[in-house]
Amino acid sequence: LSVWFSVPSLVGMLKQVKALSPDAMPSLRVSVFGGEPLPDSVVAAWRAAAPNSRIENFYGPTEATVFCLRRAVTAVAKLSPERDFWSIGRPMPGSEAAVVDQALNFLAPGSTGELALAGVQLADGYLDATELTSRRFPEIAGQRWYLTGDLAIQDADGEFHCLGRIDNQIKLHGYRIELEEIDTHLRQVSGNAMAATVAWPIADGIPQGLVAFVGDRSVDAGAIIARLNAVLPAYMIPGRVLGLDSLPLNSSGKIDRKALCQLLDQFKA
């Protein structure tokens, strides 16, 4: 085995089943991660398991023929602001990236907005969905772009950072909260790469609270909440922390928040 490609959350699953011991994969030469944010904790575990492998962090949606930005994982970490995951780097040849506001104005480095992509690799649109195509593939400054639905920021070095999905940004008791920001601290204080936060319960379409999940059934919920209290404001602290043997993944191999909410609904019933 000389080449590896997967979503980062698969590494967390390998750790859970004790399949990621130091020097477990010495033959690996190239490791590519994509499809979701790459936590630095995953990088550390992978470096120990595959010490001879180069690591690449790729980003890109299906609508842009998948990967269109990349970042080599170097000895010096390049982490996103207020996050524990790696930069997605710069556009590949033939691709362009920018951060835009809701009015589709280009934003300067340091400003948070939606990540937009352009280039020859863009899809023509969605089959039999003209309205959706026009909304997601607008013309900006005379050029066709794709709006990814991802929050992003460009730093002073020109690198892009994906800060999570816009639809994972919720409003709870008047506060705007990014669930991925909680997840970052949850991974750090639990020491577990498999961690996620959901808004639950939902009443009349409005979030009423937060519940966190960690991929370890023996997790000490009280200790985790205490540690979160030391690094997060009160309105971002989950009301409960639940441990599972493993967290559900969707067809893309990403943690499935919808399935976690459905699990909570079943418990409530």
Residue ranges and their predicted role:
Residues S2-F5, K15-D84, E96:
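Gly/Ser/Thr-rich phosphate-binding loop
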